Every structure is written in structure tokens, then in C-alpha cells.
């Protein structure tokens, strides 16, 4: 509450006093002002008053400044109005400040032109004097001109200028108040911006970064080559305001160091206050129209204009050549040509529009400025039409390629599987792909299920051995255990006539053991029968031996086929018996022709690796029956000869039969072997 009362009191105190601001003496006021304004003069009659009362001197001063008639109400002696001549007015008794602007309201109309009344800080182009269309649409162009002078990178400046130009162009084209002439003038003045921002936008987008990087070095090299600094320094030395500028610099430096309290005293003039010759800026402006120019001054001014214009045109020509060559060398071979076209295209457009003024301009323009009025001289700074079209095509294709690559990259990135917070791929990222079961996917199957699946697959696949292909082998259908046992027994009974003693060892099938034991008991009875049979019997025995070899080979082949099927096997091996040799080595004998020839002990006996075992047995029985009726004389000789050959052949065959177990071992199974010994 106390704070609120204090605030109300402070608000009403100023209004309760007649003179809240005390009157300060001039010395105090001047000292106060000099603390903030070092250039404020010492001897200035100035005071702060709450309600100032105008005096006669002040009234006369206001009359001088405003250039109007003022009647002094306090003076009763003079009531006549005086006509003031603006040409004789001078600014007196007021300190000058660099912050004071010479406004049209308080300045004499004699030296302020009407066109400068609303200059708005721009003395080059008065946008306010334009028509409605150019004036309203020129705001963006005005901002674009300001952007050129701002401190920023060329990349940012390029984009901002193009943005402003686009807005101004849209305004001119869409505003109904803009007629054809307005649009034509706008296009002529902004043709360089149109070329940079529209026609060759892709080229400038690709080269503006390089231009920004190399601009500082190129500018320094071109300044040294064209001697621009020397030219401007020369013209500064030749100006008529050299002394005035020097005095101003000295005064500012003195004010900064405290040695000079009024650095701008040279603007007021030493004799201005006393009514002498005007030497200050205001005095010079006030009397400029009173001194008509002499012919010598006009001639000198024209010569100065031609010389200055000649130097400017020379520097412009040199800078265009230098910029074009330097930037072409550093930035893709075309940046300098593009920049040169931006600068000279408005000049070329103005030459086409103002072709009538060419002779007039050429009459007083120096030779160095011929490229401003002559298309032939300007052509060296312009881009060739073929190169212009080629640059458009090249950068258009480059942009299209970048767009395709960017789209392909975006498509590739979109197809990548995003990961969750644990780094696991999200399955919803690929909805078009079907999920595939993986043994490593523990989220689908447990470890026990994986192990069971692996062993179940191994059980279904039996251990299979590689079957060797024998081109000359005739396959016989496998027999069951009873048929195999009967066949072995019958063959043993038939061939046991030539064997004195047989020791049988049976491994494996018990049925085969019983049959073989019965065959050994009947051997003695069969020996006497075979001895009385004669020649036919002997020949039959020999032929039977061959047939036995054929049958035993077929039987062995059947046994081999049974081995591959995983069944039990019975093989007989005997060095002197053809049955043992045939049964144990049929795989090798029938696989190639050479072992078969070695197995035939004589030329009359041959072992064939084909035929059925049952057919061989039937043919043997029929042959033995027919041979029983033959001559007994031939039996003894032929039997002995053939028997000896048979024995030797069978021995040779039995030597080769030793390789049969190895062949059986290669099948991956252990065969059951029945061995017969005791040769006769």
C-alpha cells in the first residue's frame, strides 16, 4: 500500500508545480551539452526553460530560418511587415551538427530543388516520382539495391536478390495498373537479374559457392591489374574540395583527441557571422545560384567529365575482362562468362531500346566508352549463344542426374530395415517379403526343438554308399535266405566230386550252416558215382565247373546287390575251388573283361559274367545226364587234362580273388566270410 501511495505522489507532484524544470545558467547548460557533444561550441547563449518566452532576437532568427513573415507582438514601435529575400538569408547563431538534416521545411527554397523534397534517402532513383505501378512494385527492387551494399556472403546475397526480383516481377506482371511500357522498362532494367535468377538459375546454383570462395582473391588481382585504387586516389587529389575534406578530417581527429572542441567549424565559415564573404557549406549553397558559370568553368567541367568518364569506362572494360578470365579459370570454366553477361545484358537491352540516342551519346562519349553504345564493341563481353544453350543443357542434365541419384538413394534408404532400441530389425519394415524360418531364430523354435529336428532328419536318411557303375555287369534279382541256401547246397553237391576233403566254416546265416553240413556228409557217396561215369562224366564235370563258375558269378553278383541293400552276406573264398573264387570276386570279374580272361585256366574253359544262376544249374544237370552215356575211354584222358587245366586256372583265378574282400570293404559294411581250405 505504501508503494502505491508513493507512486501516486510522484505522478501528481510535477503537475502541482508551475515550473518543475529549474532554469539553468548558460554555462551549466553548455557544460552539460559538451559532456555529451564534444563539438558543442563554448560561447552559445542557450538555456533550459520550462515555458520559454520568445525574445526579439529569437523571433528574428525563426523568421530567417522559416523564410516567412513574422510580426513581433512585443514591439509596439514597428508594426510594418518586412519582405525577406531568401537569397540573402544565412544560417547564423546556431551550432551546426552533423546529425542535422537540411529539410525542405526550414531550408531556403532557393537552393533546394523540388525534386529533392521527397528524396527518401535515395538521390539516384526517385521511386516516389514514378507512376503507381512502378512505385508500388519497386519496393523489392529498392531492397535488392540495399542488399548489394550489405556485408554478407555472395551465396546469401545471390539468393536474397533473386527472391526480391521474383517478387517485383510478379507484381509488375500481375498488377493491372502496369501497362506495356512499364513492363518493357522493367524488363530492360532487370534483364541481368532475369538472366541470373531465371535463365541460368541452375548454372549459378552450381557455381555460386565457388564464386564466393574465389571472390576476394579475384577482386584483389583485378584491382591490381586495372589500377582502380590509383585512379580514385588521383581523382580525390584533383577535386576542388581537397582542403575542405582535409580540414574536416583534422577537426574530427582533434575532437577525438580533445585538442579541438569544434571540429566542424570549417562548415560555418570564419566570416559568415560578420556578414563577410561566405566560406561555409551553407554559404556556398546559398550563393551558388547568384554566381553564373563562366565559359571557362563550363569548358573545364566538360573536360573533367570526359576525363572521368573515360577513366571509368576503361576500368569497367578492364574489370569485365579480368573477372571473366579469372573466374573461368577457377570455377568450372564458365562462371566468369556468366557474371559478365549479368553485368552487360542491361546495357545491351538499353542499346536496343534507345537506338535513336546512339549518335547523340557517341558525339561526346570518349572512345573508351564505345562498348556502351556500340553492340560490336560490347559483344566481346557477352556470352555466345551456342555456349549459353550448351550450359543450359549441361546443367539441366546434371540436375536431372542428381535428382535420379537422390531418388534412388531415398528408395534404398526406405527399403532398409529399421532397428528397434535393442538393435533387432523390425519385421514390419518389409511387409512384401515372406519370413523365412532360420535355425538361429530362437524366438520361433527352442533349442530342444532344433536338436530334435536335426536328429529326425538324420534318421530318415539312411547311410548310403556310392554305387560303382560296371558297364558289363548283369544284375540278378536278389534271393531270399531259403533260395540262397538251397542254391549253395546244390552247387556244393555237384562240384564236390573233385574234392577229397572239404572243411566248411560257416559264419552268419544258420540255415546255410545246416545245408552245408548235410552236403559234407553226402560227399563220399558222390565220389564213387563220379569215378564210374567215364568220359562223358569227366567232360560233364569240366563243363559243370565252367557252368559253376558262371553260376557262382551270378550268385556273387546277387550277393553283392544284397550287400548294397543292407542284408547279410555269405561269401566263400578258396584258393583251389572255382566256387570260392567266383563267389568272392564276381564284382571285379564282371566289372572288366581282363580278370575274366585270367580266370579261365585253359583256352577251352571261359568264365562269363552274365546269365542267370538257375539257368546255369539246369544246363549243368542236362549236360551231366547226356554225358553219362558217352565213351569211357575219352573220359579218362580228357578228364585228367581238363582237370589239371581247371585246377591251374582256378588257382590263378583264386590269386586274383584276394582283392574281393577289399572291394567289399569299400562298401562300408563288414561281410561275413565262409572260408574253404584243404586243396586236393
Swiss-Prot record:
Region (Disordered): 460-680
Biased composition, class Polar residues, residue ranges: 520-530
Protein name: Chondroitin proteoglycan 4
Coiled coil: none
Keywords attached to this entry: Glycoprotein, Proteoglycan, Signal
UniProt-annotated glycosylation sites, renumbered to this chain: 42, 59, 72, 167, 205, 458, 472, 486, 498, 526-527, 556, 604, 640, 644, 664
Signal peptide: 1-18
Pfam families: CPG4 (PF15481)
Low complexity biased stretches: 484-500, 633-647, 654-669
Organism, as annotated: Caenorhabditis briggsae
Lineage top rank: taxon: Eukaryota
Amino acid at each position: 500500500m505504501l508503494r502505491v501511495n508513493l507512486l501516486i505522489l510522484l505522478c501528481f507532484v510535477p503537475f502541482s508545480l508551475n515550473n518543475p524544470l529549474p532554469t539553468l545558467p548558460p554555462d551549466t547548460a553548455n557544460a552539460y551539452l559538451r559532456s555529451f557533444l564534444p563539438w558543442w561550441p563554448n560561447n552559445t547563449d542557450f538555456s533550459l526553460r520550462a515555458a520559454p518566452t520568445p525574445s526579439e532576437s529569437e523571433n528574428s532568427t525563426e523568421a530567417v530560418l522559416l523564410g516567412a513573415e513574422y510580426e513581433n507582438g512585443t514591439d509596439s514601435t514597428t508594426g510594418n511587415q518586412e519582405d525577406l529575400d531568401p537569397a540573402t538569408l544565412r544560417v547564423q547563431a546556431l551550432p551546426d551538427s552533423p546529425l542535422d538534416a537540411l529539410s525542405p521545411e526550414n531550408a531556403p527554397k532557393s537552393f533546394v530543388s523540388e525534386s529533392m523534397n521527397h528524396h527518401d534517402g535515395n538521390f539516384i532513383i526517385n521511386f516516389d516520382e514514378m507512376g503507381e505501378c512502378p512505385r508500388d512494385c519497386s519496393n523489392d527492387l529498392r531492397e535488392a539495391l540495399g542488399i548489394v551494399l550489405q556485408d554478407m556472403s555472395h551465396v546469401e546475397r545471390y539468393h536474397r536478390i533473386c527472391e526480391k526480383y521474383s517478387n517485383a516481377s510478379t507484381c509488375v506482371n500481375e498488377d493491372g495498373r502496369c501497362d506495356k511500357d512499364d513492363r518493357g522498362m522493367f524488363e530492360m532494367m532487370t534483364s541481368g537479374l532475369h538472366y541470373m535468377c531465371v535463365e541460368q538459375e541452375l548454372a549459378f546454383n552450381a557455381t555460386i559457392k565457388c564464386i564466393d570462395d574465389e571472390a576476394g582473391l579475384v577482386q584483389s588481382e583485378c584491382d591490381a591489374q586495372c589500377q582502380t585504387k590509383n585512379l580514385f586516389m588521383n581523382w580525390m587529389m584533383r577535386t576542388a574540395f581537397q582542403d575542405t575534406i582535409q580540414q574536416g578530417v583534422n577537426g574530427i581527429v582533434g575532437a577525438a583527441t580533445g585538442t579541438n572542441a569544434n571540429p566542424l567549424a570549417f562548415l560555418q565559415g570564419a566570416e559568415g557571422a560578420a556578414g563577410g564573404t561566405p566560406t561555409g557549406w551553407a554559404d556556398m549553397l546559398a550563393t551558388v545560384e547568384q554566381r553564373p558559370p563562366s565559359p571557362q568553368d563550363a569548358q573545364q567541367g566538360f573536360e573533367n567529365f570526359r576525363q572521368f568518364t573515360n577513366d571509368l569506362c576503361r576500368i569497367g572494360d578492364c574489370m569485365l575482362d579480368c573477372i571473366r578470365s579469372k573466374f573461368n579459370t577457377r570455377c568450372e570454366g564458365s562462371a566468369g562468362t556468366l557474371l559478365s553477361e549479368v553485368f552487360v545484358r542491361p546495357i545491351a537491352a538499353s542499346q536496343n531500346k534507345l537506338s535513336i540516342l546512339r549518335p547523340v551519346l557517341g558525339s561526346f562519349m570518349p572512345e573508351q566508352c564505345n562498348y556502351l553504345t556500340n553492340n560490336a564493341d560490347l559483344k566481346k563481353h557477352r556470352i555466345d549463344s551456342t555456349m549459353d544453350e550448351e550450359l543450359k543443357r549441361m546443367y539441366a542434365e546434371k540436375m536431372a542426374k542428381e535428382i535420379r541419384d537422390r531418388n534412388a538413394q531415398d528408395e534404398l534408404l526406405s527399403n532398409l530395415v529399421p532397428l528397434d532400441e535393442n538393435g533387432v530389425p523390425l519385421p514390419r519394415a518389409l511387409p512384401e517379403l515372406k519370413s523365412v524360418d532360420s535355425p538361429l531364430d530362437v524366438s520361433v523354435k527352442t533349442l530342444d526343438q532344433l536338436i530334435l529336428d536335426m536328429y529326425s532328419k538324420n534318421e530318415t536318411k539312411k547311410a548310403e554308399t556310392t554305387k560303382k557303375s560296371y558297364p558289363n555287369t548283369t544284375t540278378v534279382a536278389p534271393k531270399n535266405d531259403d533260395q540262397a541256401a538251397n542254391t549253395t547246397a546244390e552247387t556244393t553237391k555237384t562240384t564236390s566230386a573233385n574234392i577229397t576233403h572239404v572243411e566248411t566254416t560257416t559264419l552268419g546265416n544258420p540255415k546255410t550252416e545246416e545245408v552245408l553240413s548235410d552236403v559234407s556228409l553226402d560227399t563220399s557217396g558222390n565220389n564213387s558215382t563220379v569215378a564210374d561215369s567215364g568220359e562223358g562224366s569227366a567232360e560233364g564235370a569240366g563243363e559243370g565247373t565252367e557252368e559253376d563258375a558262371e553260376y557262382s558269378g551270378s550268385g556273387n553278383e546277387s550277393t553283392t546287390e544284397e550287400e548294397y541293400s543292407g542284408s547279410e552276406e555269405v561269401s566263400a573264398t578258396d584258393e583251389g575251388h572255382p566256387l570260392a573264387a567266383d563267389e568272392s570276386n564276381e564284382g571285379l570279374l564282371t566289372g572288366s573283361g581282363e580278370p575274366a580272361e585270367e580266370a579261365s585256366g585253359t583256352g577251352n574253359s571261359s568264365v562269363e559274367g552274365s546269365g542267370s544262376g538257375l539257368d546255369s544249374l539246369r544246363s549243368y544237370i542236362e549236360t551231366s545226364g547226356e554225358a553219362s552215356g558217352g565213351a569211357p575211354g575219352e573220359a579218362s584222358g580228357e578228364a585228367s587234362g581238363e582237370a589239371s587245366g581247371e585246377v591251374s586256372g582256378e588257382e590263378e583265378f583264386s590269386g586274383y580273388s584276394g582283392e574281393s574282400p577289399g572291394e567289399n570293404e569299400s562298401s562300408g559294411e563288414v561281410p561275413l566270410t565262409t572260408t574253404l581250405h584243404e586243396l586236393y
